[in-house]
């Protein structure tokens, strides 16, 4: 029997941090409605609906004007739910899909035209990377987004990441357990990637690799600060809402955003993380914040 991911925190708390116009949440997922977009079979777990409308409510509460929807493992390589969200919110949203080698150029163009700018590769799904697919997606202006956990997986994909054509993105700060420290082989691999000038890292999912079960995940701060110090122009923030496959105390998304005040005390650096860096990576119109704000 599959586990069911608990729903996200339902608190209506707003963040203390006042984000600038154009602020972007660069990592979240949309589930359902399953009546229209059923999950694939087989799948690793189940989840309740966390729809586009739910996401838009969260964006308003956090003060976000834009966002990047990331394909979830619950949909496999069926990007229909993602495509629907992008078409309904073309100014506000961009996407990261999950496609396979057999995808046609026509299908890739359809996804690109809708706002897809990257493809997520999951070590857990397949440790073998299709480099030909990465090269092909590069021709469409997409970047590879690498999702892995721990030192051995980081090392296994190191050469592939460094050989990526153009920009590439690393999920969840590289997901290195905090107990291993800043000098671990895994975290040094992430820093080596950042130093290429082509790597971007998502400041997301601190709960997943912290040794602490609840906010503020204080042991993550040195890792986040080191990533920001190394490449302030190539780090972006993501909520990871609705936090799939998480069975410990559910983090509050407003308080996750507030962690940026500690990770990046300088307001100008936070503005890069939240506005300027996402604009450059995902192709939002420069300086354009979505004026069509949604209300609860």
Question: Which stretches of residues belong to each language-model region?
Answer:
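Active-site phosphate/pyrophosphate- and oxyanion-stabilizing loops and adjacent acidic/basic residues
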Residues: 56, 83-84, 158, 191, ...
């Amino acid at each position: 029997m599959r586990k069911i991911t608990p729903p996200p925190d339902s608190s209506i708390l707003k963040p203390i941090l006042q984000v600038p116009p154009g602020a972007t949440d660069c990592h979240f997922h949309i589930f359902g409605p399953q009546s229209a977009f059923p999950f694939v079979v087989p799948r690793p777990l189940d989840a309740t609906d966390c729809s586009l409308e739910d996401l838009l409510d969260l964006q308003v509460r956090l003060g976000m004007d834009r966002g990047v929807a990331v394909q979830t493992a619950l949909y496999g390589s069926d990007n229909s739910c993602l495509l629907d969200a992008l078409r309904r919110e073309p100014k506000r949203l961009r996407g990261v899909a999950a496609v396979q080698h057999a995808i046609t150029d026509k299908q890739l163009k359809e996804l690109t035209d809708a706002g897809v700018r990257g493809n997520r590769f999951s070590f857990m799904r397949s440790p073998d990377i299709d480099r030909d697919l990465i090269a092909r997606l590069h021709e469409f202006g997409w970047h590879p987004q690498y999702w892995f956990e721990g030192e051995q997986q980081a090392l296994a994909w190191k050469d592939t990441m460094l050989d990526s054509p153009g920009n590439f993105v690393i999920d969840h700060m590289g997901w290195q357990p905090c107990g291993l420290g800043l000098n671990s082989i895994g975290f040094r691999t992430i820093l080596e990637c950042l130093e290429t000038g082509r790597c971007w890292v998502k400041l997301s999912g601190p709960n997943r690799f912290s040794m602490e079960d609840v906010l503020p995940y204080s042991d993550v701060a040195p890792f986040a600060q080191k990533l920001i110090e190394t490449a302030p122009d190539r780090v972006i923030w993501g909520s990871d809402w609705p936090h799939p496959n998480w069975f410990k105390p559910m983090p509050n998304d407003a308080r996750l955003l507030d962690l940026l005040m500690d990770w990046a005390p300088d307001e100008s650096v936070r503005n890069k993380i939240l506005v300027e860096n996402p604009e450059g990576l995902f192709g939002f119109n420069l300086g354009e914040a979505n004026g069509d704000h949604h209300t609860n």
